[in-house]
Amino acid sequence: MKEDMEVLSLASLPVGFRFSPTDEELVRYYLRLKINGHDNDVRVIREIDICKWEPWDLPDFSVVKTTDSEWLFFCPLDRKYPSGSRMNRATVAGYWKATGKDRKIKSGKTKIIGVKRTLVFYTGRAPKGTRTCWIMHEYRATEKDLDGTKSGQNPFVVCKLFKKQDIVNGAAEPEESKSCEVEPAVSSPTVVDEVEMSEVSPVFPKTEETNPCDVAESSLVIPSECRSGYSVPEVTTTGLDDIDWLSFMEFDSPKLFSPLHSQVQSELGSSFNGLQSESSELFKNHNEDYIQTQYGTNDADEYMSKFLDSFLDIPYEPEQIPYEPQNLSSCNKINDESKRGIKIRARRAQAPGCAEQFVMQGDASRRLRLQVNLNSHKSETDSTQLQFIKKEVKDTTTETMTKGCGNFTRSKSRTSFIFKKIAAMGCSYRGLFRVGVVAVVCVMSVCSLVA
């Protein structure tokens, strides 16, 4: 008796039955039969060109109607170029982009029968596409008898489409922030109801050593802004009264600062005694004529000191002279004794009203007297030079008149010598007058020679 086999629909199956083949079953059974042309045996998986449809339209073409977000399709290999190996994965709204690396599919433990590649759908165009929640696994056979080039074979791949549930309502994600892991596994978050906080122990242990200046009791409180719940302890100062502050002020010990004479002598020994004797003899001879050193004597310094003392070591004895306005003109008189040196004259007493003015003027009158004194010496020197110049001019004139024009060059040289002497003279009024007289005489002598 012939038994008829009844085909059951998926809707009539009990709950828990579903079409979910493994990776090895997809390649070893379904893909092999499809490549070899046995379409009726694998009609449970529909053939469709993935790149001609958008991913959100593909679930409606699935043969198996399921509530799971997983669908299987056969897809023919659509090469981008006839002679190339790249696949055309672009659609109207976007493109499929491979991510990660290919994973091997094994039969048993060692035999490799295929590879699995993961692709993610992006809307827009590369490289500014936006990642979506649609994921696809592409299963390809790697055995030589399934390359699709033999007679009766057609190149196919199996595509498993997923829709990730963690991206709600197709929320977009930029391509730059994509992840390499695109497995459709959905992770369930772990909810923590209660978090018990343990008591925080201090990091540094308390030290039992106390400072000698510990504080015991006081009403002094240091103000501070503490934003935490910790309150600042009160600072006490009563214990400060028990401290012997005088012990800290004994800093005059020779061990802290300079050593004592006995300490230095004990450390240095005989060398310290020799140094002390030499230093005493050095200061003992400061009143003698000179001091002998390893570099010579100080004779030159002694001579210079005596020379300066002859001018500066003059006793100053001010005279108390009553203030007389008519005697102010007498301060310009020159003392005859000043010719041998500089003598500081006594300062006359000033009137009470002129005391402030005298302080402001300082020693201006003294400087004037010194200047007059110097001019007086200069005038005497100029008189001697003037007599010599007159004699030279007279001799030159006589010689020029006697010898005539032949000796004009010689007279010219003598005249230049005369002008040099004139330039060496001082610039006093009497000297200028005498120079003018000499110049007139010279001009007259030259004119007579020219005539």
Curated annotation (Swiss-Prot):
The modification Phosphothreonine is found at residue 142. One of its GO terms (molecular function) is DNA binding. Keywords: Activator, Antiviral defense, DNA-binding, Host-virus interaction, Membrane, Nucleus, Phosphoprotein, Plant defense, Transcription, Transcription regulation, Transmembrane, Transmembrane helix. Induction: Induced by bacterial pathogens type III effector proteins (TTEs). (Microbial infection) Accumulates 2 days post infection with turnip crinkle virus (TCV). It is a single-pass membrane protein. Phosphorylated at Thr-142. Phosphorylation at Thr-142 is required for nuclear import. This is NAC domain-containing protein 91. It comes from Arabidopsis thaliana. The gene is NAC091.
